[in-house]
Amino acid sequence: MKKITAKSADSITLATEEINMKKELIERLRRFLTAHDMIGTPASDEQVLCAEQELGVKFSSDYIDFIKNFGTAYAGMMINALDGNENVVEETKSLREVHPEVTDTYVISDDGSGNPIMINSKGEVEIYYHDSDAEIKTIAPSLEQYIEDNFPEW
């Protein structure tokens, strides 16, 4: 398995402490999702803890902020939470059945071509190119940044 980290002039380094999603971004998302009736079922603290234990991971604080506010919802791409048919637990388990070497991540979406979009133990957003020698590429330093980069407000 190859791991590639995208580097750019504007990339940031995350501190070791967890960073919560900016209030301004949460409010932008809330306005958009409410206007388009696209908010899922928000996750409870208990549901988050159970999912983390079942998957053996610790969710990033910005992912927790997102799913506790919006559940499964659209933010430039569909972000899977704990509700719905394509939820983070089932999608992560499905990936691990086929690719058992992927253990410290959880699947939050896909790219539309079947390549899972995941968050790793550092909180970085990665894409797993399952058809190209199991290549993993870091595409954003955090979920918050990934949403900022990909969220079009219609």
Positions of PLM-derived features:
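A surface-exposed partner-binding patch
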Residues: 15-117, 151-154
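Segments surrounding the PLD/"HKD" phosphodiesterase catalytic module and close analogs
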Residues: 117-143
